[in-house]
């Protein structure tokens, strides 16, 4: 079988056929289509008609991208189940129950890529080494801090490190290898606000960097966020993997 199978302007039946091939052989599906998107779960949302890219991976990951921004506008995590009913592709996550439906108005092209990739990402660079140091010695942040995640996708971006403090509060760390600026503070605030929407007020945000600009310091104080001074480690030995738990470990505060 070919590594890449492509159909331009496919019918609904051809789309379903390619989804079946991808499921059977572990292929990555990319769909270029005009569609509507409906989400039901912890909340409800609807995205009107527009041109989008839909990506379905063998592990159940389901991503919908617009023609802007890095992050998907809607997504489902690995382990979700994908099916097709009439002209809609549906992704179901069981726990917590979430349903994402893509109603296809017009399909421009579908590609199935039978990818083989068995490698794990080996992070390098100062911020990766800072993260490794924090996981190995959490007390550099504060006594009783317990890091749980690294590079964790949440609704509004990817959190560098997420964990719990000694009182059970969720703690978000934003790491910067150089002097942190206003943008770093705004990014941290966005992550904290996103998690507060889901888990309540007991969420802390800590900016971790060698130093701060004066503007960043003032904004941190204004937003009720914190700062920890930490220099990036000098060595580059960063081969040990850090085990992570799922976000479902946390319970709403």
Swiss-Prot record:
Xref: CDD domains: NucS-like
Pfam families, alphabetized: NucS_C, NucS_N
* UniProt keyword terms in alphabetical order: Cytoplasm, DNA-binding, Endonuclease, Hydrolase, Nuclease
Q: Which domain of life is it from?
A: Archaea
Keyword Transport on this protein?
no
Localized where? Cytoplasm
User: EC number(s) for this protein?
Assistant: 3.1.-.-
Cellular component GO terms held in the UniProt record: cytoplasm
Q: Molecular function terms in GO for this entry?
A: DNA binding; single-stranded DNA endodeoxyribonuclease activity
Q: Where are its TM segments located?
A: none
Q: Which InterPro entries match?
A: Endonuclease_NucS, NucS_C, NucS_N, NucS_N_sf, tRNA_endonuc-like_dom_sf
Family the entry assigns = Belongs to the NucS endonuclease family.
Protein role: Cleaves both 3' and 5' ssDNA extremities of branched DNA structures.
User: Which HAMAP family does the record match to this protein?
Assistant: NucS
Name the record gives this protein: Endonuclease NucS
